[in-house]
């Protein structure tokens, strides 16, 4: 089994694009210039293609929501480390604006695609915010059979065992969300 490090660099969103822009829209808007070869936006093929893409996007969003509903009480716990996978956050963090983790490479049976998509939902808080049960990054260590945080006190990961990380029991102050955005990348 091959593990590959994935680095998430937390950077401010690019204001030139809307939150709903998909990578193809971003690439085409930054790389292309108006040309006479552009498809007619009113052509039947263009409209059908756009509807097909919209349906595909909605299906992916619905699947993501189904997954997230099941993971809601395991916030910030990298739960696949409990199985035979060796996914884990890297400790220490490479920098204050970087969170790094590894994931096992896998392939679905009967799926010939050569690309996978990884969706990460990040909550950004102030650097001065002390890690707590709601604002943490925890991995499972099989040798010690316990959860450990990237930073902060070890007990902030105890909720990962219970599967209930929804309410901070010893938060020093309420987290303040600085900003939220989403982005996509190919590996």
UniProtKB/Swiss-Prot annotation:
A family per Pfam: Zona_pellucida
Domain of life the protein comes from: Eukaryota
Region called Disordered, residue ranges: 166-187
Record field: compositional bias (Polar residues): 177-187
Tissue: Expressed in spleen, thymus, pancreas, testis, ovary, small intestine, colon and lymphocytes.
GO cellular component, one term: nucleoplasm
The protein's name: POM121 and ZP3 fusion protein
Organism ancestry: Eukaryota, Metazoa, Chordata, Craniata, Vertebrata
Encoding gene per record: POMZP3
């Amino acid at each position: 089994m091959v593990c590959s490090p994935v680095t998430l660099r937390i950077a401010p969103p690019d204001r030139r694009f809307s939150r709903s822009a998909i990578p193809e829209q971003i690439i085409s808007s930054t790389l292309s210039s108006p040309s006479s070869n552009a498809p007619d936006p009113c052509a039947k093929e263009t409209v059908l293609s756009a509807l097909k893409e919209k349906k595909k996007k909605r299906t992916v969003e619905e699947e993501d929501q189904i997954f997230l509903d099941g993971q809601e009480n395991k916030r910030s716990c990298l739960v696949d480390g409990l199985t035979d996978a060796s996914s884990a956050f890297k400790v220490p963090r490479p920098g204050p604006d970087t969170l790094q983790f590894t994931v096992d490479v896998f392939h679905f049976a009967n799926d010939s695609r050569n690309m996978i998509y990884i969706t990460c939902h990040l909550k950004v808080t102030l650097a001065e915010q002390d890690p707590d049960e709601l604002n943490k990054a925890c991995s499972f260590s099989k040798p010690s059979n316990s959860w450990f945080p990237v930073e902060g006190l070890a007990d902030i990961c105890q909720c990962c065992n219970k599967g209930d990380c929804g309410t901070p029991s010893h938060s020093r102050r309420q987290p303040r969300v600085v900003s939220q955005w989403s982005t996509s990348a190919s590996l």
